Structures are given as structure tokens and as C-alpha cells.
A protein has these predicted regions:
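Class A GPCR helix-loop hinge within the 7TM core
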Residues: 108-146, 209-211, 294-302
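Extracellular TM2-ECL1-early TM3 structural module of rhodopsin-like
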Residues: 24-33, 58-118, 125-135
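Intrinsically disordered regulatory tails of 7TM GPCRs
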Residues: 1-19, 168, 257-270, 299-346
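Intracellular effector-coupling site of seven-transmembrane GPCRs
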Residues: 176-181, 192-196, 208-246, 258-272, ...
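Extracellular N-terminal segment of 7TM GPCRs
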Residues: 1-41, 45, 179, 188, ...
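Internal alpha-helical transmembrane segments of multi-pass membrane proteins, especially GPCRs
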Residues: 64-67, 108, 142-146, 190, ...
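Loop architecture of class A 7-transmembrane GPCRs
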Residues: 10-18, 84-105, 128, 134, ...
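Hydrophobic alpha-helical segments of membrane proteins
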Residues: 75-78, 154-161, 197-204, 233-252, ...
Length: 346
């Protein structure tokens, strides 16, 4: 009797898992469509304004390139949405499978490296004010951005070089053509260390140094010039951290399945694979958040929004930290000068 019931229970469990997976897939398609539209429109607007309407400054160059990375990420999301709608059938061929994966990973690395460069730039600007006033140029910012894009391509290729289409009787899938679990595990660790951990350490150290520096400034809202970039960095790491946690759990599940496979584990993995879509949606969400952060964290944004979007972005990307530190440096020199004059009078 038990032998008769067991297969029935397994069939019911599998059927429930399929229904759940299908429902989650539809929700994710809807979320990805929203992210794609807002990401393309929002970042397209930032690119248009910072690239064509605003005066070129170092900050404008940083955020222009960040918007380009997010725009590419959002635009290529269209191909993933179509694939998800077709129940993960990939109709675009081998080259687009590789290119779509390359752009997705490349954009992630570029965003991370740009945020790291912005943090280091802010750190140097707060500690070495004279250097920031004389050596910090738009040309150098453009060269650094070019190097960042080249480095992003180099870091991305090992992760996507094995991407290919897998054709079966029922559908064609865009897959990572890695057979060995150990190779996949190394890729997960590599992506986490290079694309998340090291940048996080550098960015954290930069803002600790900035905090130490501005603590000595006797100004109200002394961290105000840094709040937009801080918000951008925090949103990036909060959006991407669950993705890397998921990847390590996925590796653990694969190891479990390799050593002790079971129907229950397979059913759980099927639902877990759909949870991945929500986690990826959170990572994708980061690509459309930045334009909203620029606008809503801008000082008096409602008043400036009525006048011009250009003014909103100019205010958001203003290099106030340099002006703040320059004023502090000048007042310090002035007080020293007055002190020196007093001694001579005696």
C-alpha cells in the first residue's frame, strides 16, 4: 500500500512545484518589463543630459559612464524577457547568447569599477585639495573610464566565453557550457571577489578616510556633497549582495545533488531556480534606480524640476566637495596668516 501511495505523492509534489515555478516566472516577466522600461528611459535621459546638455566636469563624466553601463544592462534585458516568456527557449542564436551574457556581466563589472573610481576620486579630493584643483581634469577622467571599460571586458570574458546554445527536441537554451562543478565554483568565487568583495573593501576604506577628513571641517551638513554617491553605492551593494549569496547556495545545492540526489531535492531546486529570478530581478533593479536617486536626492529638486531637468542633474553632479574643502583650506590659511601678523606686531 505504501509503495502505491509514494509515486502518487511524488507526482503531486512535482506538479505543485511546476505550478509554483510557472506562477513565479510570470511575475518575474512583469517585473523585468518594468525594470527594462524605466532603466532604458531613465538612463537614456541621464546620458542625453550629461552627454549633450551639461558642461563636462569630472563628476559628469563618471555618472555618464555609469548611466551607459546601466542603459546597456537594461536594454539587453529585452532578450531575457523574450526568452522567459517562451519558457526559457532562446530564439536568437549562438552569437546573441554570447553577446547578451557578455553585456550583462560587462555592465556589472563596469558599474562596480566606476563606483570604486568615484570613491577613490572623492577620497583623494578630500585629502589632497591642491591636487584636486590642478591635476583632476576631464581628460584624465575620460582616460580612466576607457581603462575601466577595457578592464571590464577583460574580467567578463572568462565568465562568458563558454556561453552557447543547447538544442534539444523541445527547445533551444542559452547555457553556460561548463560540465565540471569545480570549474563553475571557481567562476562564482572569481566573480564575487573581483566584482564585489575587493571593490567593497576599497570603497569602504575610501569613505572611512573621507569621514575622518570631513570630521575636522566645522561645517553644517558636511557630508551633504557625498550623499548622492553614497546612496548610489549602497543601492548597488544591497541589490547585488543577495545575488552572490544565492550563487554560493546554488553551488552547495549542486554539490548535494551530486553526492546525494533525491526527488525532494530536485523539486526544491526547481522552485529555488525560480527564486533566482527574483534575486536577479533585485540585481536588475539597480540598473534603473540611479536616475531616480539623482533626481530625488537633489537639493530642492521639485523647484528645479519645474525649471529644467538639466539643472536637476547639474545640482546632483555638482562638485560641492571641492568647494567645501577649498573654503576650509582658504579659511585655515587666513587664520594662520592673521596669527602670524599678530606675532610680528608684538
Amino acid at each position: 500500500m505504501n509503495q502505491t501511495v509514494a509515486p502518487s505523492n511524488m507526482t503531486a509534489s512535482t506538479s505543485n512545484a511546476d505550478v509554483t515555478a510557472n506562477s513565479l516566472r510570470k511575475i518575474n516577466i512583469f517585473l523585468h518589463c518594468i525594470i527594462c522600461v524605466f532603466g532604458v528611459v531613465g538612463n537614456g535621459l541621464v546620458i542625453y543630459i550629461t552627454g549633450l546638455k551639461m558642461k563636462s566636469t569630472v563628476n559628469a563624466i563618471w555618472f555618464l559612464n555609469l548611466a551607459v553601463a546601466d542603459f546597456l544592462f537594461s536594454f539587453f534585458l529585452i532578450f531575457n524577457i523574450i526568452s522567459e516568456y517562451r519558457e526559457f527557449d532562446w530564439p536568437f542564436g549562438d552569437f546573441m547568447c554570447f553577446l547578451n551574457s557578455l553585456v550583462t556581466v560587462l555592465s556589472m563589472f563596469a558599474s562596480t569599477f566606476l563606483l570604486t573610481a568615484i570613491s577613490l576620486d572623492r577620497c583623494l579630493s578630500t585629502w589632497v585639495v591642491v591636487w584636486a584643483r590642478t591635476k583632476r581634469t576631464v581628460l584624465k577622467a575620460r582616460i580612466i573610464c576607457l581603462l575601466i571599460w577595457l578592464a571590464s571586458v577583460a574580467c567578463s570574458l572568462p565568465l562568458v566565453i563558454s556561453r552557447k546554445t543547447s538544442i534539444s527536441a523541445q527547445q533551444t537554451k542559452c547555457i553556460l557550457g561548463i560540465q565540471k562543478l569545480e570549474t563553475y565554483k571557481r567562476q562564482v568565487v572569481y566573480r564575487f571577489v573581483v566584482g564585489f568583495l575587493l571593490p567593497f573593501v576599497i570603497i569602504s576604506a575610501s569613505y572611512v578616510a573621507i569621514g575622518v577628513r570631513v570630521k575636522h571641517l566645522r561645517k553644517k551638513n558636511k557630508l551633504k556633497p557625498f550623499r548622492i554617491i553614497l546612496a548610489v553605492i549602497l543601492s548597488f551593494f544591497f541589490c547585488w549582495l543577495p545575488f552572490y549569496v544565492y550563487k554560493f547556495i546554488e553551488v552547495w545545492l549542486r554539490e548535494m545533488n551530486a553526492t546525494n540526489p533525491s526527488d525532494e531535492l530536485n523539486s526544491f531546486k526547481k522552485v529555488f531556480d525560480q527564486i533566482e529570478l527574483f534575486i536577479i530581478s533585485l540585481a536588475y533593479l539597480n540598473s534603473c534606480l540611479n536616475p531616480f536617486l539623482y533626481v530625488f536626492m537633489c537639493e530642492d529638486f521639485q523647484k528645479k524640476l519645474k525649471q529644467s531637468l538639466v539643472m536637476v542633474f547639474e545640482s546632483a553632479f555638482a562638485e560641492e566637495h571641492l568647494a567645501l574643502l577649498s573654503q576650509h583650506s582658504q579659511s585655515k590659511r587666513k587664520s594662520h596668516s592673521q596669527s602670524g601678523t599678530g606675532i610680528e606686531m608684538k
